[in-house]
Curated annotation (Swiss-Prot):
<comment type="subunit">
    <text>Heteromultimer composed of HisG and HisZ subunits.</text>
</comment>
<dbReference type="GO" id="GO:0004821">
    <property type="term" value="F:histidine-tRNA ligase activity"/>
</dbReference>
<comment type="similarity">
    <text>Belongs to the class-II aminoacyl-tRNA synthetase family. HisZ subfamily.</text>
</comment>
<keyword id="KW-0963">Cytoplasm</keyword>
<dbReference type="GO" id="GO:0006427">
    <property type="term" value="P:histidyl-tRNA aminoacylation"/>
</dbReference>
<dbReference type="InterPro" id="IPR045864">
    <property type="entry name" value="aa-tRNA-synth_II/BPL/LPL"/>
</dbReference>
<dbReference type="InterPro" id="IPR004516">
    <property type="entry name" value="HisRS/HisZ"/>
</dbReference>
<protein>
    <recommendedName>
        <fullName>ATP phosphoribosyltransferase regulatory subunit</fullName>
    </recommendedName>
</protein>
<keyword id="KW-0028">Amino-acid biosynthesis</keyword>
<keyword id="KW-0368">Histidine biosynthesis</keyword>
<dbReference type="GO" id="GO:0005737">
    <property type="term" value="C:cytoplasm"/>
</dbReference>
<comment type="pathway">
    <text>Amino-acid biosynthesis; L-histidine biosynthesis; L-histidine from 5-phospho-alpha-D-ribose 1-diphosphate: step 1/9.</text>
</comment>
<dbReference type="GO" id="GO:0000105">
    <property type="term" value="P:L-histidine biosynthetic process"/>
</dbReference>
<dbReference type="InterPro" id="IPR041715">
    <property type="entry name" value="HisRS-like_core"/>
</dbReference>
<comment type="function">
    <text>Required for the first step of histidine biosynthesis. May allow the feedback regulation of ATP phosphoribosyltransferase activity by histidine.</text>
</comment>
<dbReference type="InterPro" id="IPR004517">
    <property type="entry name" value="HisZ"/>
</dbReference>
<dbReference type="Pfam" id="PF13393">
    <property type="entry name" value="tRNA-synt_His"/>
</dbReference>
Length: 379
């Protein structure tokens, strides 16, 4: 189906992609919903347009391109390394603007030199934006999920709390709520009278008794176990929730995490600052810092202007599949995000790839770029 109402710069943008050694691909507008619901993150999940096939399969209008491009790569058994480019419509509910809009971008799959690939993708995004917005000063914000994960692991947090914090990475308010919860452990009573009662009866320490109690309660209230989670699933989730709520992180560890999340400085200064932080906090995060250092060095070798880039330790993006680098690009002095991306090394394996495929990429919001071009002309 031909694309209509494309921005005037679309042809030049595609030519830029071709010069960056990419293969242009398209994907169906109607997509299986499950991969997005499982892997895309809560922020995107609640904005997806859902539908259903005649056979009952959950489907959705394409809300983004990364997952469809990766699925296409797996289905066509294309070798790697491979760089894909795309331009097409995506569909998601937005607070501002149309729910149907154009995105374009590059997905860089299979390069084992992750630092070089990260630098290349950031450079690609800066290149195509600079060509659309000559004379405008860009600003680049970078974060690193792998460094964040290394810090919370080194602080000694239980796995359940690590998952919660990783899930909240990039959401400053949610991270603060979770840190506040870690500073103020709760008793089972905060979850209601019923949970307090089963705790008093010792059922939280006896999973079989708890499972039987939940099963009897479900049966008595007419709740079908086929309609949702099983009694055992509910019991395990309840135990985990109560156990996590009772955990307190000592003041020193909380101070370390807050000191890390407060780091916000020019990217060129970030490696030294992170090493100082790790040394002062006595955290063994050498592997994560080595990867971070390699990426900063690769960006310098690629000729990226360090004056445009800033590292924020608390910066993340609202998609669950990111594993390392995350970044956004806009115009200095304006709030609009024109490009965003990052590394997603686990995604292709989760989607069914038979081997590990490192991956990194970015997306462009063409409507926002069009508005930025118009604003520049009006000045």
């Amino acid at each position: 189906m031909p694309l209509i109402n494309l921005p005037a710069f679309a042809g030049d943008l595609l030519a830029d992609f071709e010069r960056r050694n990419t293969l242009r691909v398209d994907t169906p507008v109607i997509q299986p919903a499950e991969p997005f619901l499982d892997m895309a993150g809560e922020d995107l999940r609640r904005r997806i347009f859902m539908t259903e096939s005649e056979t009952g399969e959950s489907l959705c209008l394409r809300p983004e391109f990364t997952i469809p491009v990766c699925l296409r790569h797996i289905e066509t058994a294309t070798g790697t390394p491979q760089r894909y480019a795309y331009l097409g419509e995506v569909f998601r509910q937005r607070r501002e603007g149309s729910s149907e809009f154009y995105q374009a971008g590059i997905e860089d799959l299979g390069d084992p030199d992750t630092a070089a690939a990260d630098a290349r993708v950031v450079g690609d995004a800066m290149f195509v934006l600079a060509n659309r917005l000559p004379g405008e000063r860009l600003k680049v914000t970078l974060g690193d999920q792998s460094v964040f994960e290394a810090v919370i692991a080194a602080c000694g947090l239980p796995g359940g709390w690590q998952k919660r914090l990783i899930h909240a990475f990039g959401d400053q308010k949610q991270l603060e709520r979770l840190l506040a919860a870690l500073a103020d452990p709760k008793s089972p009573g905060v979850f209601g009278h019923d949970v307090e009662r089963v705790a008093a009866l010792g059922m939280l320490e006896d999973e079989e008794r708890l499972v039987a109690h939940i099963g009897e309660t479900m049966k008595a209230t007419g709740y079908s176990t086929n309609a949702g989670r099983s009694p055992r699933d509910i019991a395990r989730r309840l135990k985990e929730k109560v156990e996590l709520a009772a955990i307190r992180l000592d003041k020193e560890a909380l101070g370390v995490m807050r000191a890390f999340l407060a780091l916000d400085l020019p990217l060129a200064d970030a490696p030294a600052a992170l090493h100082r932080f790790a040394g002062k906090a006595r955290l063994k995060i050498d592997d994560a810092l080595a990867l971070f250092d390699a990426r900063v060095a690769a960006l310098a070798r690629a000729g990226a202007d360090p004056g445009l880039m800033r590292y924020r330790a608390a910066f993340g993006r609202p998609l669950d599949y990111y594993t390392g680098l995350v970044f956004e690009i806009g115009v200095e002095g304006t709030p609009a995000v024109l490009a965003g991306g990052g590394r997603f090394d686990r995604l292709l394996t989760l989607l069914g790839a038979r081997e590990h495929i490192p991956a990194v990429g970015f997306s462009l919001w063409l409507d926002r770029i069009e508005q930025a071009i118009a604003a520049g002309r009006a000045e």
